[in-house]
């Protein structure tokens, strides 16, 4: 239960990777809002992709401007921080193929300038956004106890709690 887990933590956070395809604003918005609800305040996006990932069936890169839109989308849902994984390409192993801000020699990759632009924009907007809150006109209740109960005693084999939640979101 993420709500119980978050009680003793300083902040709530999540990792956001697209994998194959491109930004799905509804799904990511729902997860942003759920994460904000764990502590009933702002959250951090502690990992998001700088370009492509290395573990999906098709590891396409993000379109130009897509990472910037993703960062502002997170802020609009209450993120206080947007962090990228990873900074520099690994010298070996699976993650050497994961998108990064700089290559193994420290030279900027194509995504570096977009991340730098996001940082500049955040620096300008920070005084306006500090201590702001997200105001919602409606709420959807999320219950892990109900979700787990339904998983163990399905009333219909095709029922998917998360898909049902996202349908109403």
Regions from the PLM with identified roles:
Residues 6-169:
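Carbohydrate-binding surfaces of carbohydrate-active enzymes
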């Amino acid at each position: 239960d993420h709500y119980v887990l978050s009680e003793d933590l300083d902040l709530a956070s999540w990792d956001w990777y697209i994998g194959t395809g491109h930004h799905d604003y509804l799904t990511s918005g729902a997860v942003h809002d759920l994460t904000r609800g764990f502590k009933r305040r702002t959250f951090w996006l502690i990992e998001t992709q700088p370009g492509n990932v290395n573990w999906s069936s098709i590891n396409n890169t993000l379109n130009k401007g897509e990472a910037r839109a993703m960062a502002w989308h997170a802020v609009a849902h209450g993120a206080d921080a947007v962090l990228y994984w990873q900074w520099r390409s690994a010298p070996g192993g699976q993650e050497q193929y994961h998108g990064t801000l700089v290559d193994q020699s420290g030279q900027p990759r194509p995504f570096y300038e977009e991340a730098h632009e996001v940082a500049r924009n955040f620096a300008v907007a920070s005084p306006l956004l500090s201590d702001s809150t997200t105001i919602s006109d409606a709420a959807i209740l999320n219950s892990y106890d109900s979700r787990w109960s339904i998983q163990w005693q399905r009333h219909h084999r095709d029922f998917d709690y998360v898909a049902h939640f996202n349908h109403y979101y």
